[in-house]
Amino acid sequence: MSAAELARMDAVLAKQRAAFTAAMPEPASVRRDRIDRAIALLIDHQHDFAKAVSADFGHRSTDQTLMTDIMPSVGALKHAKKHFEAWSRNEKRKAMFPLGLIGAKAEVRWQPKGVVGVIAPWNFPVGMVMVPMAGILAAGNRAMIKPSEFT
């Protein structure tokens, strides 16, 4: 990777981090909207994705791509959409001894971490990006994607 490409990636990462910080805290409706848009993107362009993957492989059935890349991705996104609010609820925990004796309380507060990287292999180029994106978007994070240079 050239120095210019690295500098460009660093600039994009800095913009992603700044946008993440500026938008905090984002409501659940924003996460839901992002997941909905990812689902719509996959469904609306499923045949375009399948044709592109077939052209890259030179022999891969478009039906195989629909079954192994598109459908699992949509399923993961729908699952994340259904459960992300429960996943992000605070969880009460028992305070360590002896702090509990003096009224201490403990809980886990799930929070987005920022910008998450996704490095996808060549063999399932759509699914290996979009399935992790389900969790990334559900958690309220942003992503930088690096697809394989072979597809």
What is the role of each PLM region?
Residues 95-151:
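Conserved small-residue-rich beta-alpha loop and adjacent elements
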Residues 1-105:
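N-terminal Rossmann-like NAD(P)+-binding subdomain of aldehyde/semialdehyde dehydrogenases
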